[in-house]
Amino acid sequence: MVSLKLQKRLAASILKCGKGRVWIDPNEIADVAMANSRDNVRRLIATGFIMRKPVVVHSRSRAREHNAAKRLGRHRGAGNRLGTREARLPSKILWIRRIRVLRRLLKKYREAKKIDKHSYRELYLKAKGNVFKNKRTLIEYIVKSKTEKLREKLIQDQAQARRNKNKSIKDRRAAKSAAKEIVSSN
């Protein structure tokens, strides 16, 4: 058997592919063996004695199917897991995700003037202290605290109005009694 290493290398260079993809016609080995220059190899390529093999298809259809099933929750059971829960998804990463969501929301609310800077700081520190499990609980807390503040303000206003009313009544009574004393002394 004649060595066709040189011809294969030259053909690979000309065809711009790897040596593994170069096909040499087994019936024309004698002619191919005689080709010892690039021009001769080009001639053999033109005649069809040397060809470039097509790329071997490595289908991803099975992998795609498997990934689609995984998205539906298949192949995720205890038997398919390697590594502890912490190794698979560290609690620190979960914390970072959660705190970033909460802080982004607080910042947005502060910029939209939904909360003032004092409540922002208070809620920021509460979020840092792991008070809020998720975004929804934080929003609920904000709404609840706002309604509570409004209620307290309303109660304070009513109490102040009551105090003012009582004071005015007291003043009127005092003025009346003072007027009576003046009349009785005359």
Swiss-Prot record:
The keyword Ribonucleoprotein applies. Residues 158-186 are annotated as: Disordered. GO terms for molecular function: calmodulin binding; RNA binding; structural constituent of ribosome. It comes from the Eukaryota. PROSITE patterns: RIBOSOMAL_L19E. One of its GO terms (cellular component) is lipid droplet. Keywords: Calmodulin-binding, Ribonucleoprotein, Ribosomal protein. SMART domains: Ribosomal_L19e. The keyword Electron transport does not apply. GO terms for biological process: translation. Belongs to the eukaryotic ribosomal protein eL19 family. Ribosomal protein that binds calmodulin. NCBIfam families: PRK08570.1 (NF006343). This is Large ribosomal subunit protein eL19. The gene is rpl19.
